[in-house]
Amino acid sequence: QLLEPDADAEYAAVIQIDLNEIKEPLLACPNDPDDIKPLSELQGNKIDEVFIGSCMTNIGHYRAASKVLENMRNLPVKLWIAPPTKMDKFQLTEEGVYSTFGRVGARTETPGCSLCMGNQARVADGATVVSTSTRNFPNRLGNNADVYLSSAELAAVVASIGRLPTVAEYLEAVAGIKPMAAEIYRYLNFHEMDEYRRAAS
């Protein structure tokens, strides 16, 4: 059951965002999660490494990334993959998503925080990175790394071309996701997951 507010709940502030006004992806720029710019102002910037992982992602983001990368072979960047839970990894492996990541040469990490905390590995010193994590503070993912924060879908497009795409390139690359969105973004239902609990134990 989802949480719901009391009918008489009071809020410190109410922020309304009209999503119809957002016509392109937004990124947090190095190295400040509050420094937000549209993709069109950043297009063309070269990227060395891409991290799709951390608690900010869910299973659908990996299916979407796999869809973007399905016809690729060798990527021009180092791609890191780290789903948030073992159950996600198990299901993605069953669906063949991990096969796509393996074919393109992605480095698959132990599910969990991974690069976001720099507690399993780190990006190269001075690398320019696109990450799906929540923070891009200086030196968090790697020494002197410049880290953009983006969606998993944009991160996958970046991994395929080695730079921040134009808006047109992005829209073309993700066009195959929308017709399959209901299946791609289907959640795992944890209350129905005895087999996954066993697999993750």
Task: Give the role of each language-model region.
Residues 1-201:
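Fe-S-dependent hydro-lyases/dehydratases of central metabolism
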